[in-house]
Amino acid sequence: MKNEELKAMKNFYLKKMFAVVVILFTACVTGLADDHKGRLQVGTGFLYERGMDLTVAYERETRYHNAWEYFGNVYLKWDECSSCGHVCPKSFWSNYNTWGLGAAYKPCVVRGRNHHGNLRIGGSLGSDRHGVVGGVHAGYEHSYSLRKGWQVYWQMKSDLMIGGKDLFRTGVVIGVKLPIK
């Protein structure tokens, strides 16, 4: 009789423990299956007139594909060399460079099955070789979802730079977003 009672008690506790594990598992899995993902974003492109842009950012997606982006940006503007008359390494790398750190809010304006589009509104603060440069950024970004959380995107951007050599920067950037867990 004792063996039967022990077996019944053991089965009861095993069933209870199994039920607790199933409940915890379902609660945790559904808690992780959302759109609130962080992504590492790397993009490069060309800006008018004779400018090149590299942006590395962390994007935090909120509800309905809206997002916050925290970015670091490097800008290079090249010019023709005065001695040789065309672009040489010195006139390319040493003409005008800026860097900046900033944030942008990206409300979603277009949603589709495997893509979405966001407005990009933000600001930055950085430096060139001589002083402080501030920026007001506006544009449009369209992202396409790939497998395993990867995304590719293109971005049309316009920057109003305060205190720099360029007042307006307009161009196109393409890049990739890598999921961060």
Language-model-detected regions and their locations in the chain:
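Internal, hydrophobic beta-strand segments that form the core of beta-sheet-rich folds
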Residues: 155-156
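Small/flexible residues
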Residues: 12, 17-18, 41, 62, ...
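Cleavable N-terminal export/targeting peptides
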Residues: 1-37, 180-181
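Short glycine/proline- and aromatic-enriched beta-strand/turn motifs that initiate or cap beta-hairpins
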Residues: 31-78, 171, 177-181
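Compositionally biased, low-complexity repeat tracts
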Residues: 27, 34, 39-41, 96-98, ...
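Solvent-exposed loop/turn segments connecting transmembrane beta-strands
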Residues: 42-55, 93-97, 125-136, 160-169
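Gram-negative (and chloroplast) outer-membrane scaffold detector with strong preference
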Residues: 59-152, 178-181
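A periodicity- and composition-biased signal for non-globular, repetitive helical segments
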Residues: 8, 16, 21-22, 66, ...
